[in-house]
Each structure stands twice: as structure tokens, then as C-alpha cells.
Amino acid sequence: MRLAFMGSPGFAVPALRALHAAGHDIVAVYCQPPRPVGRGHRIHKCPVHEAAEALGLTVRTPERLRRDDAERAYFRALDLDAAVVAAYGQILPADMLVAPRRGCINIHASLLPRWRGAAPIHAAILAGDAQTGVTIMQMDEGLDTGATLLAEAVPIGPEDTMVDLLDRLADLGAALVIKVLDGNFPPVPQPEGGVTYAPKLSKADAEIDWSASAAVILRRIRAFRPWPGTETRLDGEALKIIRAEPAAGQGEPGTVLDDRLAIACGDAAIRPTLVQRAGRAAMQAEAFLRGHPVAIGTRLG
């Protein structure tokens, strides 16, 4: 099948590789442009860009498709059977959605209509969902509102982080989109009920609100690993909490309760087990406390 592939982050790479391995003719790969990253502002290509070049595929990196008439004309002229989209990072204009003979097919990391939007994996963990999954969807002009072609659920374990689920869902999405392209799956409109949204996250979401329940804070730590992370303030400096576990005790939210760094939350307490100071490597909490003792009664945040 003659395809375009549109994706940017690591989540999309397994699908690109699976389509290529299955023998589909991928005539163009669209992804976000290279951007400066880190303190040195070195130009960095996104994971899909690097994977596509390794496969010898043509890469297109338009900055804004909606404003790029020439790029949209190029896309329409590709004579595509379908376009496969996976976390591309841009909204596709209407003329592109209908250009391929089978339209544009999206790999979405949730069981639609639950968690439409930019951060469905994070949202599922934050909500305490027992499961999530992947939906292969026929795209329309709405935000993840298109008809469902195929979906499969994945359980969320009590210790699963965003990265754990990301890897499993990426592999599942690759397998499901191959099935859809090779088979005949009639589109099923999404139900009107059960719609929830997963908005885009920002660095501001990293700050821990210690007045929240221990369960909510633990879910945030799992959901926001590695980005945007979860952090608090200790002695005026940022302290990232990368892993944590439930702990006994109660107190004023944000207060250190014992010499092993149990921290009071809105209803109970948590104990960080892996932390990171600004500019330092991550370390076990025990090692951190040996070099940086924290007195009982210290307030964080």
C-alpha cells in the first residue's frame, strides 16, 4: 500500500518500522522539524526523523502545515492509499484528511472516547484507571472524534509509569495498524457518552501539591515520569521525586515526619525512594539523606 507516515516521538517509531517491515511503500515521512535542545542548544532530530533516515525514507518537516500551501499540495500529489498518523504534533487541514483514498488513520493511545487529546497515557494513570489501550481511528476534523476501526485494551499495573505504558502501547499500536491496513474493519462511530479529555501538559504541572491525597500524589509521580516530572522545594532548591511509596503517618501537608523522609500529604504520607537535586544525578533516598539530612518537621514546597 502506498503510504505517508506522520509522527514525531518515540511512541510512533514502532509503527513506522512495522509498516516498513510489512512491505508498505512509505513515500513520505512527516515529523516535527529539528530543534535546539539542552544548554548547548544543539540541533536535535525527533525519534521518527532519525528512524526514517535509518530506513532510507524521505523525510518532510514543515513548520506549520495549515500555513504551508506548497507542502499541502505536495501531500495531495503523493497519490496515497492512506496516511498513518501517530502523535505527529500538528493538526491536519481538511484537504489533507481527505486526500488519501482511505483517508488518514490515527494511532491513539487510549480507549476512545475516553482521553481524547494530547496526553492520554498520563491522564489514564492520573485518574487511577484500571486499563487503557490503543484505538485505531479514521481521522476527521475533530479532536480525536473520528470513527473507531479497531481497539484493544491493556491493563495498568499498580506500579506502571508513563514510560512502562508508552512502550507497551507503542508496540500494540504498531500491530493494530498493520491489521487495519491488511483487513476490512468497518468504521464505528464513537459513543456520545464517556468522553473525557487529556490536555497537553506543561512544566508547571510538575509542582507537587502536598494537600492532595497520598494516592493522587503517587499517581502523579508515576504519570509524570520522566516528563514533566514531579518536584517540590527543599531549602529553597528544587528536588525531583522520581519514585515513592506509601508511608505511615499524618501531619501538616508537606511536613517531614521521620528521619527516612516520610512526607505528610492531605490524608496520609508518602516516602520518596528515588530523588534528584537540581544539576545532580538521581540517587536513592537513603544516599541523599546521608549527604543531606532533613530534619523532622521540615516543610517542603
From Swiss-Prot:
Annotated CDD domains: FMT_core_Met-tRNA-FMT_N, Met_tRNA_FMT_C
Pfam families: Formyl_trans_C, Formyl_trans_N
Keywords: Protein biosynthesis, Transferase
Catalysed reaction, written as an equation: L-methionyl-tRNA(fMet) + (6R)-10-formyltetrahydrofolate = N-formyl-L-methionyl-tRNA(fMet) + (6S)-5,6,7,8-tetrahydrofolate + H(+)
Class of enzymatic activity (EC top level): transferase
GO molecular function: methionyl-tRNA formyltransferase activity
A cellular-component GO term for this protein: cytosol
Binding site for (6S)-5,6,7,8-tetrahydrofolate: S110, L111, L112, P113
Disulphide bond pairs: none
Signal sequence bounds: none
E.C. no: 2.1.2.9
Stated family: Belongs to the Fmt family.
Function: Attaches a formyl group to the free amino group of methionyl-tRNA(fMet). The formyl group appears to play a dual role in the initiator identity of N-formylmethionyl-tRNA by promoting its recognition by IF2 and preventing the misappropriation of this tRNA by the elongation apparatus.
PANTHER family hit by this protein: METHIONYL-TRNA FORMYLTRANSFERASE, METHIONYL-TRNA FORMYLTRANSFERASE, MITOCHONDRIAL
Stated name of the protein: Methionyl-tRNA formyltransferase
Organism: Acidiphilium cryptum (strain JF-5)
Gene name linked to the record: fmt
